[in-house]
């Protein structure tokens, strides 16, 4: 088995000006950002703020003026046609410059460049950057909130609620040449979206959590390259912090905001200027009886491969046995674009050691030591096991003297992922979709489907040891170290704890304020 452990304003002059291509200067402009993000897709304001970095091999370089152009197409920006905004300012300001051009509407792409003068000479024009204005008004959303406002008979709602993922899908066709396509999506609490079998974007655990009574976040993606003639859009929706895991334990402290739900607009613009919008409505199909049987950040994820929907993200899938999605309760919070970079996988790291260990209920087990505390999960390569066999992954920050996991600090949190085999794995890769863990150590065990059946204890142990590979670690927006791996739009403690008595936010406030 393989486990992948993976700035002041002066006189302002605005006029049309032709871009020239001077020789490369020692001064360069780079790292163009809109609201401190690179090429963001869900800008939630018609007047965003722009900024850039000044690079030079010389000393004493001070900006004296800047020239910004903003265009409606990349070609116009490259040709120097700032049809949305063309502005030259005598100023040393290079951050938080408010857009002052034509009024921007929802679902508008903007392409921009900047050139500066400095005490050490003039820069060349920067590369073209972009931003996309999101859906600024509720009236811009055609999609309804859909899902199920109840649990299924096999699901458990108690101190350790067990609610599985909701799988939703719809098919549509397109006609004519597509100029661009943009997906606007909010899946509460978490989502993974697919178009024609391809995963949309590289974000994980999206969207970031909020106080859903005040704000609900949506993401936007450029999906132009994913759209064909016959199409399917499919979304798996997890619980996240919307449907909470311990709601019946301390309801006065742990707010439950409702059942998982989805809202989506897919805006397709054709080359002739016409638009088509695919949105969530009463025609979508839904199933709650899929492979993800349970998911939350405290307890982990339970995945049963025997319940997989083979091909459900592709057009032509037979969903006749699925039920029709219901129109569900609307969240109280205002729907706003995600004005943060989003969480992605930072890197995959090698474990420091892998040690066999005896665990009473397991056929075989190893303990993985990463050598450092991280926030993330294990990605595992499942060996040739029998249907019903379970790979269990338990997480901890410390170990006992005998090498077993020390998990007393987790209290009521299980912090455990399960993969239940269908018997046809033969080296398939798997990782949880809707949970993550704070840990240094992980105990990986194979649990037999029938505990009384005779097994060969060492049949997979050498494979466990020799093929242990890497670990997925998540990226955090913020400073390095602790801060970087503890951010999910807002600062968080490790996911399995639910108290903040140590003053983590106060202790790291200085580093947060200095983070790029």
What are these regions (language model features)?
Residues 1-19:
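Bacterial Sec-dependent N-terminal signal peptides
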Residues 16, 21-109, 113-515:
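Extracellular/oxidizing-compartment recognition motifs
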């Amino acid at each position: 088995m393989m486990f992948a452990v993976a700035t002041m304003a002066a006189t302002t002059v605005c006029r049309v000006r032709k871009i020239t291509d001077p020789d490369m200067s020692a001064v360069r402009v780079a790292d163009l950002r809109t609201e401190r993000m690179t090429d963001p897709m869900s800008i939630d304001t018609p007047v965003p703020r722009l900024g850039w970095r000044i690079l030079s091999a010389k000393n004493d370089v001070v900006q004296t003026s800047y020239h910004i152009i903003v265009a409606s197409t990349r070609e116009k920006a490259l040709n120097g046609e700032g049809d949305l905004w063309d502005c030259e300012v005598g100023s040393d300001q290079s951050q938080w410059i408010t857009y002052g051009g034509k009024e921007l509407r929802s679902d508008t792409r903007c392409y921009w460049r900047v050139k500066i003068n400095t005490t050490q000479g003039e820069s060349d024009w920067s590369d073209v950057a972009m931003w996309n204005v999101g859906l600024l008004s509720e009236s811009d959303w055609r999609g309804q909130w859909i899902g199920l406002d109840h649990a299924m008979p096999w699901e458990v709602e108690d101190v350790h609620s067990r609610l599985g993922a909701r799988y939703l899908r719809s098919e549509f066709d397109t006609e004519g040449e597509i100029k661009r396509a943009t997906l606007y999506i909010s899946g509460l609490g978490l989502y993974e979206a697919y178009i024609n079998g391809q995963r949309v974007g590289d974000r994980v655990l999206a969207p970031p959590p909020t106080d859903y009574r005040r704000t609900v976040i949506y993401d936007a993606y450029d999906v132009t390259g994913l759209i064909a003639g016959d199409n399917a859009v499919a979304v798996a929706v997890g619980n996240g912090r919307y449907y909470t895991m311990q709601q019946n334990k301390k309801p006065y402290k742990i707010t439950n905001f409702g059942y998982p739900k989805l809202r989506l607009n897919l805006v397709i613009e054709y080359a002739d200027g016409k638009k088509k919008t695919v949105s969530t409505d009463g025609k979508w199909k839904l199933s709650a009886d899929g492979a993800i049987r349970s998911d939350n950040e405290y307890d982990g994820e339970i995945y049963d491969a025997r319940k997989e929907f083979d091909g459900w993200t592709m057009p032509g899938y037979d969903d006749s046995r699925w039920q029709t999605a219901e129109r569900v309760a609307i969240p109280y919070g205002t729907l706003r674009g995600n004005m943060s970079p989003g969480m992605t996988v930072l890197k995959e790291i090698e474990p420091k050691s892998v040690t066999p260990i005896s665990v009473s209920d397991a056929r075989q087990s190893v303990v993985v030591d990463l050598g450092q505390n991280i926030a993330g999960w294990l990605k595992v390569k499942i060996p040739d096991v029998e249907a019903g066999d379970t790979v269990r992954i338990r997480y901890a920050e410390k170990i006992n003297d005998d090498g077993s996991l020390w998990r007393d600090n987790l209290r009521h949190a299980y912090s455990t992922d399960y993969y239940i085999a269908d018997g046809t794995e033969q080296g398939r890769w798997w990782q949880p979709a809707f949970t993550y863990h704070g840990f240094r150590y992980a105990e990986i065990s194979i649990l037999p489907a029938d505990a009384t059946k005779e097994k060969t204890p060492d049949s997979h142990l050498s494979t466990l040891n020799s093929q242990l590979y890497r670990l997925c670690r998540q990226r955090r927006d913020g400073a390095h170290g602790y801060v970087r791996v503890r951010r999910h739009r807002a600062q968080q403690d490790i996911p399995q704890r639910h108290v903040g008595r140590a003053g983590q936010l106060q202790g790291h406030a200085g580093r947060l304020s200095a983070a790029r």
